[in-house]
Structure formats: structure tokens, C-alpha cells
């Protein structure tokens, strides 16, 4: 009966994980289809991006499962292991977790190092002209993409071989590489060291991206929701554009009347002025059409109702932005508290990656998770929300900063405008960032919760030799396992999570990674603070130039059909006819989209 109770509890945890993975799949689908361009899609790129994001999120969502499983083996109220949690059962749980972790990380590595590069080169090798001429076939395109992918894999293998041989280089100076040497490497567990080197290197690269993109997005995402209402409503934009268009055409009539009846040609000054007015007129005509569509003209009743519903519920968006803003500040404070605590109180400092035995200062995020873990799956839901928030912040950061090489912007991410190459590169960047998010959650945001969950141990001495301590009458002697670093009574009760053990192994084996990852958190906090203060001070402005450029891009792509487009507006959009329209390219920066090279309306 006791054993079946333990099996039921662990099974429910895995069922909750399966449900989370199913939801993650829908999140990945929505993310990919929201950001990719609709007129330049590749089925292979779309599929690879969706599968990759699902696998990456499934990997990071395994952390709360890890925490819940090790927590389920102990009784927090008694400070002892549960009756069903025998060493064999605990070993089986940890072994299952390790298998799932290694499987997911191996699959992630396969996607990021093989599948995504192949999809990238496959798309790059496509040439419509050669295809029409019959000089490009599926096989030639496949082999070209495979050739570049193999070259990329060779570089990666060289890097991992370095990680395999370096661990024992200091102990084996001057020895030749023979079969005994390989055997010694394997028996000394250096294969796992090589794996920890590879993951540590990728995690460190991810931390660098995490500092730039996640910190930026964490500051901008809540502020963008709060400031989502534009500086001008759709009716105001329509009226302003109509007035400018009428003034433009009046100036054209004046020039034409001034030159009417003249035998000689129009002067160069008048010709230049007229050409300038004609170009401006085309821009205003496009903008007027956008404003009309934004006001709901020509749209179905359902779309008009949907637009007004958005306007009515806009205060909820504002309220959600304020809540996320508070959450961002709390996360920042919690990370700062833990980082300072580690820097000041870690016994081994940089020699062990600033591992801390227990938290010395109250840390709000860790406290919330420890309390919520007593009522599973509340902590799982909170952790899922936290991960999705950091994930969304990373996307916002990548969209704001762009994909850059040094200071040169290579690709720009925009909703509905992201090229397939940018989508794949952003997916790899997210993979690296997710590794960094794992590190931040385990080591800074919720170190006690992520390492031991709700496990506690009893400090009371047992009266019977060999019997477990009994704290039923001594509740004051029950301590959290985060304080078990030097207590011998905790070794039989406190089971660390698989993820925390693996991350600690990385920073212990490769202290340089631990030092970089830790001090990079202060850079993260600094970047967040700078972007946060700047975004609060800077007021959003209506960028008509960007609107016109996006409208021109849409029209050149032939996207003239009216689909809904978000026009955040104010109360005038409720009383007027605010509309989401044009080209299916939502954009949170104001009005816009559609059109270019549209012909001027007849005068």
C-alpha cells in the first residue's frame, strides 16, 4: 500500500509534465507562426523551428519535475524519508531522471548542431532561377546542404575532442596517446567530464546571449505592454492624413494652374516640387487607406466587434503589464540578493563556481517557491510561468536588439516579417539562452528550491542506534536541507536534484565556466537596470516613417488583402472604429502596414 502510494505520487508528477509538454507544443506553434513571414515560408524550416522550440522548452520544464520528484521522497513535516522511499526507489527515480535529461539534451544537441544547420543550408541553397531552368534538383540541393552541415559538424567535433582530452592533460604530460590512455580516460570518468565541458561551454555562450537579450527583454516586455496605446488613435490618424492629402493636392493644383497655358515647358523648380508632391501624395494615399481600414471601413461585423473588444479589454493589458513589471523588479532584486550573498559568503569562491551552502538573506522568489512546493502542482505552474516569462523576454530582446555580429545587424526579428534564416538562428540562440535560464533559476532565482525542493531533515539524535531521528515532538529541530552542508544527519535524508548536481559538477570541473557564468549575472542586472530606466523615461512616439516603410514593403510583397492588424488605440477607438488590419503583420509600435508604389488617386 505504501509503495503504491509512492508510485501514484510520482506518476501524477510525470502526467503533469506530459500535459506541460503538450501545452509547450502549442506555444511553439504559435510563436513560430506569429513571427515568421507568411510570404516566404519553408515547410522544413517551420517544422524544424517548432520541433526545436518544443524540445528546448520540454528540457527546461523538466526542472520542476526533478524538484517535485526528489521532494516527494521526504516528509517535510517530520524531516525524514517517507516509508516507500527506500534507497533502491530513490536510485530508480534519479536514474529515470538522468535518462530523460540525457535524452532531451542529446536531442537538443542533435537539433542545434545537425538538424538546424542542415535546414539553414537547405534554405540557402534554394535558387528559383536554377530551379526554373532545371539545373537545381532535390538531390543536388540536399548534397550541397549536407556538405556544409558536415563541415560545421567537424568543427564542433574538434571542439568536443578538446574537451575530452583537456581534463587529464595536466596529469599526463609527456605520455603518448595509446589504447591504455583511452581506457584510462574512460575509467576515470573523463567522458562525463568531456560532456560537462561541452555543456558548460554552450551554457557560457548562452549566458552571454542571456545578458544581452534576456535582460533587455525582461525590462522592455512589461513596459511595452504598459505603453502599448499609441500616441494617436485611428480616427485622428485618418483625419490628419486627409487634411495633409488635401493640402498636398491643393499645392499641386496651384503649380499646374501657374503653368497652364504656357508655351514653354515647366521650369525645373516647379517640376522638382511637383515630383516631390506626387511622391508625398502616394505615401499619404497609402496611409489614408490604412487609416480607413483601421477605422473599420469595409470590414466585416465580426472584425469590427473583435476590434472594439480589444479596445474595451485594453485596460487588462495595461494591468498585466504592471503585474509583469512588478515581477521583473522582484526577479531583479532576488537575483541581486543571491549574487551578493554568494560573492560574500561562498567558502570556495571562484574555485567552485561560488557554490553557497545555504541562503543567508531572505530571498523572495526562493521563499515563494519553497512555500508553493508544499501544494503541488502550484509550484509547477509558477515555475512554468516563470520560464515562459523569461522565454518571452528573450524573444522580445532578440526582436529589439536584432541578430548581430558585433555591432552589425545581420537579421531583424519582427512579428510576421522574420525571414526563415533569422528564425533558425533565433532558435539556436534560444537554445543557448535556455541553458543560461536553467543556470539562473537553479543558482540565483530559487537556489534552495531548485536544489532540495521541500526536503527537510531532523537534527534530533536518535535514542536507538540505527533508527532514524524522530522530530515529531521537536518541530523546532527540523531544518531545511539547504542548511545540510555540514550536518552529518542530513546525508540520509537530503537528495539533491539531478540538475543542480550536474550544474555543480560543471562549475567544479571547469572553474572558469563557473566564474564567467556567475559574474555575468551582475552584467545581466546592470543591463536590465539601464534598459529599464531608459524605457521608463523615454515616451513612445508615433513613427510615421516606419509606418510608411512597412506599408511599402507589404505592398511590394503583394499583401494588399485586408486581414486583421492591431491598432492599439485609446477611447476614440472604442467610440470610433479602431481596426486591426492589413497584411497580417501585427506590430506593437503604432499603426501601419501596407502599401507602396500605390498610384496616386486621380485628381
Curated annotation (Swiss-Prot):
Gene Ontology biological process terms, A to Z: protein localization to vacuole
Keywords for this protein: Cobalamin, Cobalt, Glycoprotein, Lysosome, Membrane, Transmembrane, Transmembrane helix, Transport
Cross-referenced InterPro entries: LMBD1_LysCbl_Transport, LMBR1-like_membr_prot
Membrane topology annotation: Multi-pass membrane protein
TM regions (residue ranges): 13-33, 50-70, 99-119, 150-170, 201-221, 318-338, 353-373, 381-401, 422-442, 512-532
One of the record's GO molecular function terms: cobalamin binding
Protein name: Probable lysosomal cobalamin transporter
Organism: Neurospora crassa (strain ATCC 24698 / 74-OR23-1A / CBS 708.71 / DSM 1257 / FGSC 987)
Amino acid at each position: 500500500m505504501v509503495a503504491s502510494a509512492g508510485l501514484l505520487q510520482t506518476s501524477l508528477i510525470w502526467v503533469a509534465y506530459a500535459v506541460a509538454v503538450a501545452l509547450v507544443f502549442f506555444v511553439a506553434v504559435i510563436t513560430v507562426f506569429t513571427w515568421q513571414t507568411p510570404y516566404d515560408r519553408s515547410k522544413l524550416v517551420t517544422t524544424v523551428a517548432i520541433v526545436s522550440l518544443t524540445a528546448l522548452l520540454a528540457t527546461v520544464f523538466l526542472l520542476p519535475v526533478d524538484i517535485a520528484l526528489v521532494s516527494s521522497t521526504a516528509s517535510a513535516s517530520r524531516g525524514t524519508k517517507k516509508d516507500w522511499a527506500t534507497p533502491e526507489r530513490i536510485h530508480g527515480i534519479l536514474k529515470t531522471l538522468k535518462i530523460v535529461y540525457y535524452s532531451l539534451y542529446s536531442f537538443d544537441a542533435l537539433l542545434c548542431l545537425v538538424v538546424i544547420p542542415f535546414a539553414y543550408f537547405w534554405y540557402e541553397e534554394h535558387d528559383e532561377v536554377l530551379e526554373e531552368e532545371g539545373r537545381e534538383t532535390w538531390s543536388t540541393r540536399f548534397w550541397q546542404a549536407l556538405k556544409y552541415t558536415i563541415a560545421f559538424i567537424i568543427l564542433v567535433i574538434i571542439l568536443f575532442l578538446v574537451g575530452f582530452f583537456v581534463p587529464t592533460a595536466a596529469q599526463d604530460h609527456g605520455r603518448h596517446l595509446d589504447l591504455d590512455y583511452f581506457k584510462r580516460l574512460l575509467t576515470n570518468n573523463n567522458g562525463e567530464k568531456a560532456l560537462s565541458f561541452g555543456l558548460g561551454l554552450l551554457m557560457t555562450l548562452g549566458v552571454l546571449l542571456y545578458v544581452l537579450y534576456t535582460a533587455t527583454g525582461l525590462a522592455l516586455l512589461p513596459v511595452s505592454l504598459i505603453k502599448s496605446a499609441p500616441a494617436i488613435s485611428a480616427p485622428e490618424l485618418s483625419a490628419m492624413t486627409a487634411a495633409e492629402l488635401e493640402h498636398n493636392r491643393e499645392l499641386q493644383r496651384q503649380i499646374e494652374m501657374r503653368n497652364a497655358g504656357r508655351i514653354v515647358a515647366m521650369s525645373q523648380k516647379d517640376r522638382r516640387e511637383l515630383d516631390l508632391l506626387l511622391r508625398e501624395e502616394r505615401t499619404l494615399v497609402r496611409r489614408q487607406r490604412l487609416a480607413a481600414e483601421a477605422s473599420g471601413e469595409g470590414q466585416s461585423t465580426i472584425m469590427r466587434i473583435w476590434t472594439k473588444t480589444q479596445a474595451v479589454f485594453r485596460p487588462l493589458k495595461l494591468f498585466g503589464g504592471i503585474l509583469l513589471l512588478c515581477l521583473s523588479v522582484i526577479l531583479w532584486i532576488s537575483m541581486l540578493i543571491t549574487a551578493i550573498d554568494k560573492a560574500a559568503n561562498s567558502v570556495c569562491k571562484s574555485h567552485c563556481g561560488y557554490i553557497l551552502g545555504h541562503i543567508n538573506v531572505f530571498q523572495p522568489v526562493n521563499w515563494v517557491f519553497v512555500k508553493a512546493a508544499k501544494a503541488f502542482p502550484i509550484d509547477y505552474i509558477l515555475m512554468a510561468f516563470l520560464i515562459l516569462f523569461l522565454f518571452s523576454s528573450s524573444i522580445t530582446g532578440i526582436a529589439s536588439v536584432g541578430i548581430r555580429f558585433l555591432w552589425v545587424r545581420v537579421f531583424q526579428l519582427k512579428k510576421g516579417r522574420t525571414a526563415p534564416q533569422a528564425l533558425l538562428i533565433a532558435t539556436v540562440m534560444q537554445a543557448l539562452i535556455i541553458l543560461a535560464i536553467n543556470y539562473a533559476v537553479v543558482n540565483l532565482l530559487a537556489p534552495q528550491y531548485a536544489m532540495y525542493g521541500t526536503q527537510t531533515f531532523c537534527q534530533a539524535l536518535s535514542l536507538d542506534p540505527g533508527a532514524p531521528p524522530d522530530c515529531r515532538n521537536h518541530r523546532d529541530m527540523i531544518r531545511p536541507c539547504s542548511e545540510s552542508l555540514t550536518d552529518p544527519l542530513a546525508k540520509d535524508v537530503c537528495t539533491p536534484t539531478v540538475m543542480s548536481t550536474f550544474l555543480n559538477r560543471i562549475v567544479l570541473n571547469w572553474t572558469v565556466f563557473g566564474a564567467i557564468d556567475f559574474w555575468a549575472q551582475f552584467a545581466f542586472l546592470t543591463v536590465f537596470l539601464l534598459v529599464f530606466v531608459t524605457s521608463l523615461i523615454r515616451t513612445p512616439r508615433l513613427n510615421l516613417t516606419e509606418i510608411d516603410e512597412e506599408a511599402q514593403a507589404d505592398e511590394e510583397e503583394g499583401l494588399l488583402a485586408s486581414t486583421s492588424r492591431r491598432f492599439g488605440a485609446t477611447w476614440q477607438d472604442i467610440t470610433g472604429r479602431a481596426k486591426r488590419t492589413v497584411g497580417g503583420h501585427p506590430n506593437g509600435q503604432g499603426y501601419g502596414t501596407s502599401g507602396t508604389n500605390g498610384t496616386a488617386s486621380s485628381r
